[in-house]
Amino acid sequence: MNRVQVDFKGLPAHILENSIAAESLQNTRSSDNVLTPLTFPKSKVALWDPSANGEVVSLHFSYYRNPRLFLVEKALRLAHRHARQTNKPRFFCFLLGTLAVDSDEEGVTITLDRFDPGREQTGCLGKAPTALLPGDILVPCVFEAQHAASSTVHSSEDLNISFKMLQHFCCSKELLELSKLLTLRAQLSCSENMDRLTFNLSWAAVTLACTLDAVPIRAVPIIPTALARNLSSPAGVTQNSKRGFLTMDQTRKLLLILESDPKAYTLPLVGIWLSGVTHIHNPLVWAWCLRYLHSSSLQDKVLSEGGTFLVVLYSLTHRDPEFYQCKPSTGQQQLSFQLLTSRDSLTLYKNVEPSEGRPLQFELSSENQNQETVLFEEVLSQSVLTGTTLGAASAAPQNKLSISDHDSGVEDEDLSPRPSPNPHPVSQQTKRVHPLVPELSMVLDGSFLDGSVVNTQGSTPLSHSQSNVHRRNSSPALQGLSVLRPLVQGSVTKPPPIRRPLTPILSQPKNKLHPNPSQQTPQHSVSRKSLPSMRRSREGSSASSVSSSSSSSSTKNASPNGSFHQQRQRLSQGFPNKPQLIYSGPPTSGHSSAKKSSSVPSQTPVPHPSQHRIFHSTPAVNPCNCCTNHPSVAPLYQNNTWQGTPGYPTAVHSPCVFHCSPETVPPGDHCLSPSRQSLGCRVSPTKSPVCYHSTPPHYSPSSGPCVPTIISNKGLVEQTPSCQAQCCQVKGSKEPCLDTPMGLLPADAYRMLIDQERQLKLLQLQIQKLLESQSKVPEVSSEQNAQQQRPNQVPASPPKRTSVSIAVGTGASLFWSTPQETSTHEASSLEWQTETEPKSGCQNDSTVTSRDRSESACHYSEEHCPGSPQHPTSPQHNTSSGFGVQMFQSPVLGESASMYYQSQSQSKDLSENREIDDPRFYHELLGQVQSRLQDSVIVEDKVEQDQQSLLKTQSLSPVVHQSRKPLTTSSIPQTQKTKQPSSPPNQDRVLSATLKQLQQFGVNIDLDSSQEKTTRATVESASTLACINPEAVIPRLALSEPVGASIWGPSGSVDLSLEANAIALKYLSDSQLSRLSLGSQSSSPHSDPSTILLRRPAVEKSNVALSILSPSNMSLATCKYMKKYGLIEGEISSEEEQEDPIQVDSALGCSVQHETSKTISLGQEREEQNTAVLKNITNKPVVNLHTSPIDSQEQILQDLRPKMQLLLRGGTNSEKENATKRNLIERRSSLTENQRTQEVVDPQGSVGNFLDLSRLRQLPKLF
């Protein structure tokens, strides 16, 4: 069969139509039924024909007729009956009903036909309706026993609530209910006469006053969608009313969108449509127009040139839709309200049945003038809702986001947490650092403070503060002035507004690092600026600040210290001059600069801002609380913020301050964060916050700050507490100012501090548990000789006492003291001193211990700080003495980092007191230490030997702990020394070598003493940790090391110097920091960056800021940058660690030197507790150290190197204390050298870096 191919495409049209089925053509026409993408006209002009097609129609709730109110008599009688039964003068109830549109749609009628007695609400005074149904109108009623003609139905509060409810209804997406456009209240009263009941009824309703004008216009094409066809059909017209919105396509045809369609809230809208109504003036139309105008959900409302929008009405009486353009009436642009009232009286009879068919009728009118109207107008004029916000919504609906739409980014931003305004130089407005290691300290150059420190006190306070500085420098007795601190105490209640407290500043990097103080609240711009200076003063040695910024300090004296006006004001209220003193004093006496401050006593310590100041986010800026006190310049905010002397800065600081010379007082103890203060410090006018709980019993609040210096054990009252340092002395008079700083601590910073404290405590507890579990294993494990020794020693001391010093964010710098300390109060106290000397020194320095520990630490710092090296008169001392526990506490950590139980601290106090009872011993120790310091060369050799012995130990950290223990023991009474030599054979060769070295120094250590056992336990625990994770044990946290050492040099296998410094700055009390700084300064050379850091006299400021910057805390890029410019010696750090086995111990928490220093400082601390003489001695050496000027850091390091080594090796009993203080100071100053030594000795090679701040400043800014 032949097939013919036909080309249909070529067929004529008439043939094609006849040959192809119609069904096949539907596919080709399908495109006709497809809606093209809808796009709004590009031009929003002339969207429809605006020419009027009829008369204007006004739309309003009550435009044509006032609302009518129908009250069913039965409901009224029920209300009266309940009111009479309650026998109350005022009975609250509800009337429920409905609101309906009149049949002619010209008004509304309210019918109240139900009574609701309401139900009591728990926790609320008012009642709630029990049977409210959707669509009901709720009328709260007050039924009064007696009619009061002068009373009003609404109260001001009621009116405000009504305004808000109405506004919310207009702006929300809630279902449109006409009843919500009117809020009604009633006041009823009834008087009985025979069988007659006379009711007085007062009604008041609030509704929207916006009137709209609708003008008929020509029809606008509508896209024939299913919805449009349905609405146009007869069936659709008879259905319930519907409503929606109108949009347009590119052809300017209207597209109907239902109210529930989500597209309505994204597409441009040109109006609204409604169905199921008859007339345009229907109140429903008015209500829907208001919703369209004021809805905050409709993002794009397009109005015509005349500000009108379309209204399409599918009327019940018209087949085709009606078109109107509508706009608010003239003068009705804003969302406003009107009051409708009605008052009437009626008489009912008791025995007459209520009429069912005739309700009581009332008419609500806006024309009535009465007291209700007056009140309404008054409240309306004051209402924000009726003003700009609502008005703007009506005026420009398309651009207006209604009040409910106030979730704009800006407003959200306002509600979201963010930094407080920092009206300070851009350089200072660096982002707040919220490091994972919150204790990271910022180093700011003392110069960071404005040259113009605000002198809140005025010229007189300034001079006073200067004089205070002088006092601090000149006489410890002046410290007694710190008694004025009670004023400060008052200010403590006021948390400092400063946010920066968490990021303490070292004076040097003032510009680079957080200009915390300056960034403080603008209102305290001066204060805050001062605060930085204060901080710097504290951080930097007061001498440095005095020398370097004395010129500015004298003028800005009050300002730096008074950087917080609030605190100052508080202080000024009680002691106007004191605050200034405090301001000026703190910088001067802040740390190692005590000497300088003495040299420049007249100068306001404020200049200290230029000095290095170590600020602990938690600990007070000043090395010692007294320093905090002295810091008139000291950052007041930090005082209150960190010192814990905020509320009681003056008094509280004074005790600690006195005990803690800038050298001896651990900054952490005195400088507690607000959280710390609350934790460990009480707002005691006479005691430094830390000192309060930690203030030894011998401390007497009455003694004032100086009294705290007094060691009850010793029975010696050193008005010049360990804070004999000029800074402390000056501080005493200025202490009141400390309150100001406290008051400045911002709530968010305070919360952060509290949270950090809590986290630290949790971490400490965890670490304690870990250590305890590990300690058992270490005892069994033969790997760790130190651990074995510890178990040997531990048995003697119950494991009750366990102190964990943690360098938060520094790695785990931990020390676990043997329980022996707790078992024997005396021994434990001595041990605790040994142990805590490492700890307590550090603790005092870093305020690492928990509250209990802080208390004990405070006792130490207060007791020992004055003269005991163990309370690091110099940072080194603190570190060394606290090497075991305290060092792990992280020289900078402060109380929060390490935990001590009060029992431990108490026992320590007892033992310390007993030990202190032997002033001769401590004097001898000090003498020996001084002689050792003098013989720097010999000391250096000895240190090298010690280092070698340490290197011999299996684990540097264990060895270090062991060596530290002997040192600590040596610092402890000689009884312990004797025991130490008889220590179990388990002790490492390093221990033996160390003991030999100590004996060569003339120091006898009894390894068997309880203290020694405790020390051993501590060492062993550290050893265990080191074996498990050397980095964890050697975290480079040596803020105390002296703080600067670990900061400056590699103190541990893990480069935690930055964290250590940060922790030290944050958690060490001012006294601790001052001791560290003083120690550094005392060591005549500022060889150690740490010395410079703490001390940061005018001599060397460059090291401080960088000390905080350790590779562990830097990004790779930052590390490379620092190395590129020679700011970091990361590689050297490992070598230094190897060089200095003692430094290895510092990696454990403090260098061995630190341990020795700490041991010495512990002994000194005890001596201080026992006798003030030791404190005096310590202070003197510190002063000398400070006095010794060293122009070059290298020279300082060189000079301090031998001394530090001597401390490391020969922190023996009497020498230990003397040498320890000096060594600590020297070590701080020679931290770099020690760290270098560590590089050699420490196989774990701490990554600590020595940063040259001076060079760093010259480089481009990283932050």
Curated annotation (Swiss-Prot):
Q: Name one Pfam family in it.
A: STIL_N
Can you supply a Gene Ontology BP term from the record? microtubule organizing center organization
| Stretches with biased composition (Low complexity) | 540-554, 589-602
> Which superkingdom, per the lineage?
Eukaryota
Q: Which UniProt keywords apply?
A: Cytoplasm, Cytoskeleton, Developmental protein
- Keyword rRNA processing in the entry? The reply is no
Biased composition range(s): Polar residues: 455-468, 516-530, 555-575, 781-803, 818-849, 870-884, 965-981
Without the gene, what phenotype results?
A: Embryos display defects such as small head, small eyes and dorsally bent body.
GO CC, alphabetical: cell cortex; centriole; cytoplasm; cytosol; microtubule organizing center; procentriole replication complex
In this chain, composition skew of type Basic and acidic residues spans 850-865, 1214-1230
Q: Which portions of the sequence form the region Disordered?
A: 395-432, 455-614, 778-803, 818-884, 954-988, 1210-1243
Compartments annotated for it: namely: Cytoplasm, Cytosol; Cytoplasm, Cytoskeleton, Microtubule organizing center, Centrosome, Centriole; Cytoplasm, Cell cortex
The job of this chain, per UniProt, is described as: Plays an essential role in early embryonic development. Plays an important role in the regulation of centriole duplication and directional cell motility.
Record's protein name: SCL-interrupting locus protein homolog
